[in-house]
Amino acid sequence: MRSWLSKNRHVYWLLGLIALALAYFVTQHLGLRYHVVHLPLDDRIPFCPVFVVFYILWYFYVPGCMLWACLRAKDVFCRQAAALFSGALLCVAVFVLYPTCIDFRPAADGTGVFLALCRLIYAHDAPVNVFPSLHCYEALVLHLVTFRTPPLRARKALRLASFVLVLLICLSTLLVKQHSAADLIAGCALAVAAHSLTTYLFSKRRSHHDHTTV
C-alpha cells in the first residue's frame, strides 16, 4: 500500500478536496445571517423544470472528469485538483465571511417527473451560500482544465460536447431557480481565473523542471 501511494502521490489531492467538501457542509449549517442575492434579471428568467436534468448531470460530470483523469492522466488530475482546491477554498471563505441566500425559489407544485426532481433538489440543496455558484465554478473549471490539456485537447467533438453540457449546467442553475445571475457570473469568472492561475503555475513548474534536468 505504501509503495502504491508513493507512486500515486496525486491521490493525496483527494484528501484536500474531501476536507473542503466537509468544510462546505459545515458552512451550510452554521446558521449565519445571510445576505440576499437577487437581481432584477432574476425575475425575468422563467422557471423551466425540464432543466433540472442538466442540473443533476453536474453530479455525474464533475466526478466523471476527475475519475477519468485520476485513472488515465495524472498530470491532468493534479491540474484539476489544484484548480478546484484553490477556487473552492476561496468560495468557502466567502461563505463564512459573507454568507448569501436567494429568496425567489418557487414551490414547484404540480405533477410530472421534472417538478418532482425539482422538489427533490430543493429538499436536499438549501438555497444558501449561493455566491459564487459552485455548480458553475466546478463544472466550468473542470472543462477548461480537462479539455485544454493533452490528451483531450485534440478531441474536438468531445470538447464541444463537454462545453455544451457545461453551458446547459450553468443555465440550469438559473432556470431551476437555484441561483441568481450574479452567482453564475461570479462562478464562471472564478473558474476562468483559477484555470489561468493553475495553467501559469504548472507551466512555470514544468519549465523549472526542464531547466534543472538539462
Question: In which residue ranges do the predicted regions lie?
Answer:
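N-terminal transmembrane-helix/juxtamembrane module of multi-pass inner/ER membrane proteins
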Residues: 1-63, 109-114, 118
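Hydrophobic, membrane-inserted alpha-helices
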Residues: 61-65, 140-145, 164-172
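Aromatic-anchored segments of alpha-helical transmembrane domains
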Residues: 21-26, 88-97, 164-174
